[in-house]
Amino acid sequence: MSNLHLYTSARFRNFPTTFSLRHHHNDPNNQRRRSIFSKLRDKTLDPGGDLITRWNHIFLITCLLALFLDPLYFYLPIVQAGTACMSIDVRFGIFVTCFRNLADLSFLIHILLKFKTAFVSKSSRVFGRGELVMDRREIAIRYLKSEFVIDLAATLPLPQIMIWFVIPNAGEFRYAAHQNHTLSLIVLIQYVPRFLVMLPLNRRIIKATGVAAKTAWSGAAYNLILYLLVSHVLGSVWYVLSIQRQHECWRRECIKEMNATHSPSCSLLFLDCGSLHDPGRQAWMRITRVLSNCDARNDDDQHFQFGMFGDAFTNDVTSSPFFDKYFYCLWWGLRNLSSYGQSLAASTLSSETIFSCFICVAGLVFFSHLIGNVQNYLQSTTARLDEWRVRRRDTEEWMRHRQLPDELQERVRRFVQYKWLTTRGVDEEAILRALPLDLRRQIQRHLCLALVRRVPFFAQMDDQLLDAICERLVPSLNTKDTYVIREGDPVNEMLFIIRGQMESSTTDGGRSGFFNSITLRPGDFCGEELLTWALVPNINHNLPLSTRTVRTLSEVEAFALRAEDLKFVANQFRRLHSKKLQHAFRYYSHQWRAWGTCFIQAAWRRYMKRKLAMELARQEEEDDYFYDDDGDYQFEEDMPESNNNNGDENSSNNQNLSATILASKFAANTKRGVLGNQRGSTRIDPDHPTLKMPKMFKPEDPGFF
């Protein structure tokens, strides 16, 4: 030992200086870590802060795992088939102990955090929400007087101490009855404080966040896990009691053989598999009747009553591999807990009867708790659906009472169905109204800004003006074949299409029979007359009349900007009156586009008529007839003979052309005479309303200033 000490000392003296602690101390990463840990060490934590809230969720999961872990110690004793002996599964014990140490570490961290977590003073709860006590000494005193004892009892590694230190040094009884009784007692004693730690933790989570589970399905799964936990505990207790029942039978039969004239005599040490290769035990096994008298499969033998524990031996549960053994015990606990223990065949033993009564009562309590909580969580997911069904039933009864036509009833049903599919019963306006102004503005900007920017007219505005518009947009839903705006009706809102298509048509074209129709798609808008009305600087409060009829071609989801909101924005932000926005509005307005189209068509037709008149005049100059001073026309026969020198071959063509031009000029002279008498001028006015051409007057220009 001294040589090992000298060797290690010499090796440490010869260590290179690059690995010295001084160099490690000057590491910037190390200094950063130390600064973080020092801040955490000196900081008092807020019980409602993010750190404590997240830790409570993590620790709740750790508590559930620890509650599932502790009953696994009941599966350590095993029975080797056909040998009448018991042993401990050491490998499985090491596995459980490692995870148990990790759980104990989390409980220790929880205790340390509680010494640093502030609390609300009871005297300050009279007015307001209360004040936090940040003094470390007061926090420690309060914790030591309240929950420290329970947390410490849940943290102590009692099962590890019993398995690895107490039981191996228990003398000749370390493989006998004390083994199972002591282990079971320790595990059950510490199982209680660990469960008590979880209850106030659950209440704190609900107090901090409002719910223990964030979703309905996770809440239902949480309650189902608790129910499986109880089944897990019952199954493991049933297993260890089955082992103890088998050991009790062997012990009784062994004592009988010890008192009888039986050679070799039975010894309680033979019931442990550690003496399996003992020659005395092997000789005893050849003549003993312990195995036959304690066989649960022997129906004719009435030496011992196994009662409800007989299935553990008839199905070879005690000698099966761990997973087969565990799932069978879990199924046994789940079956009897759900059936309130009705399938149990208990013996007359008082302990067995008490255990059966406990299973019955526990099944009644926990099964009712499971059904109630799962039903509450699942009802929260279908509550809005049930409300919608009630409203739909009320709507159907109202339509039947009012005797609405089938077409109207179908449209109402379609709208109710579409509104449910779009909103799922959520009142978005009520949710937004309950939020602070700044948060509501940011949410509206996130939801509407990208959609509003898709409207080319609003894309010309700055962010502040767009925020003011987005803040006042409200969702609007319309089903197929719904007339949103009718021509001649007051316009009370502008619609910005998000999804769907609408048809915008007008008959106001300056002549009878005029019709113009366009299709509005996502990114388009309608009701632009309202924008003109909002920008007019007069005191007229009457809403403008629509010049178009807007009808939905499919289900349409849009945002609506009401008249009073648009008027408020126009009055508050004078930038809406800029020439740039005026030109952008005229360019993207469908009303102005329709007017421009008709104006171009009318101008083109006037141009074609003037071109035809000029062509006719040119043909007149090239022809053989002329006009005298009185406006009469003369043919070439009335002209001097010197002008009749053309050949005979052109005479017939000239006569046909002359007849055609004569008819055209006759009609032109007649119209010229009528116009000359009415206006005192021979000029043709293509803009006169008597002309038979389509005409659409330009929309009224707003009085921009």
Curated annotation (Swiss-Prot):
Topology, Extracellular side: 79-91, 169-180, 244-353
Parts of the chain on the Cytoplasmic side: 1-57, 113-147, 202-222, 375-705
Keyword match Nucleotide-binding: yes
Positions of the UniProt region annotated as Calmodulin-binding: 573-588
GO cellular component, one term: plasma membrane
Composition skew (Low complexity), residue ranges: 642-655
UniProt keyword annotation of Acyltransferase present: no
Stretches the record annotates as Disordered: 636-655, 672-705
Domain notes for this protein: The binding of calmodulin to the C-terminus might interfere with cyclic nucleotide binding and thus channel activation.
UniProtKB keywords: Calmodulin-binding, cAMP, cAMP-binding, Cell membrane, cGMP, cGMP-binding, Ion channel, Ion transport, Ligand-gated ion channel, Membrane, Nucleotide-binding, Transmembrane, Transmembrane helix, Transport
PROSITE patterns associated with the record: CNMP_BINDING_3
Homology family: Belongs to the cyclic nucleotide-gated cation channel (TC 1.A.1.5) family.
Binding site for a nucleoside 3',5'-cyclic phosphate: 457-580
Protein name listed in UniProt: Probable cyclic nucleotide-gated ion channel 16
